[in-house]
């Protein structure tokens, strides 16, 4: 039972991290418009830079 709960929690964390996160090479932190355009190019509604130093491009659903 403990193994199933642990696997479920790991899967939940993995899925949460995979929701719209892309690497900093998409304009962040210097050019948030590049991040926004990248996200639109992959079918999302847009995106913005997040994180302590705004180095991660996060795409909207």
From Swiss-Prot:
Top-level taxonomy: Eukaryota, Metazoa, Ecdysozoa, Arthropoda, Chelicerata
Keyword annotations of the record: Antibiotic, Antimicrobial, Calcium-activated potassium channel impairing toxin, Defensin, Disulfide bond, Immunity, Innate immunity, Ion channel impairing toxin, Potassium channel impairing toxin, Secreted, Signal, Toxin, Voltage-gated potassium channel impairing toxin
PROSITE patterns from the UniProt entry: INVERT_DEFENSINS
Keyword Disulfide bond: yes
Record InterPro entries: Defensin_invertebrate/fungal, Scorpion_toxin-like_sf
Subcellular location: Secreted
Signal peptide start-end: 1-24
Similarity comment text for this entry: Belongs to the invertebrate defensin family. Type 2 subfamily.
Top-level taxonomic group: Eukaryota
Protein's name in the database: Defensin BmKDfsin2
Tissue specificity comment: Highly expressed in non-venom gland (hemolymph) and moderately expressed in venom gland.
Gene3D superfamilies: Knottin, scorpion toxin-like
Organism of origin: Olivierus martensii
GO molecular function: potassium channel regulator activity; toxin activity
Principal location class: secreted
């Amino acid at each position: 039972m403990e193994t199933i709960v642990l696997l479920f929690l790991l899967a939940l964390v993995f899925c949460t991290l995979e929701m719209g996160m892309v690497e900093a090479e998409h304009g962040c932190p210097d050019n948030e418009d590049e991040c926004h355009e990248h996200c639109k190019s992959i079918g999302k509604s847009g995106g913005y830079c997040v994180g302590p130093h705004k180095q991660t491009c996060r795409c909207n659903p």
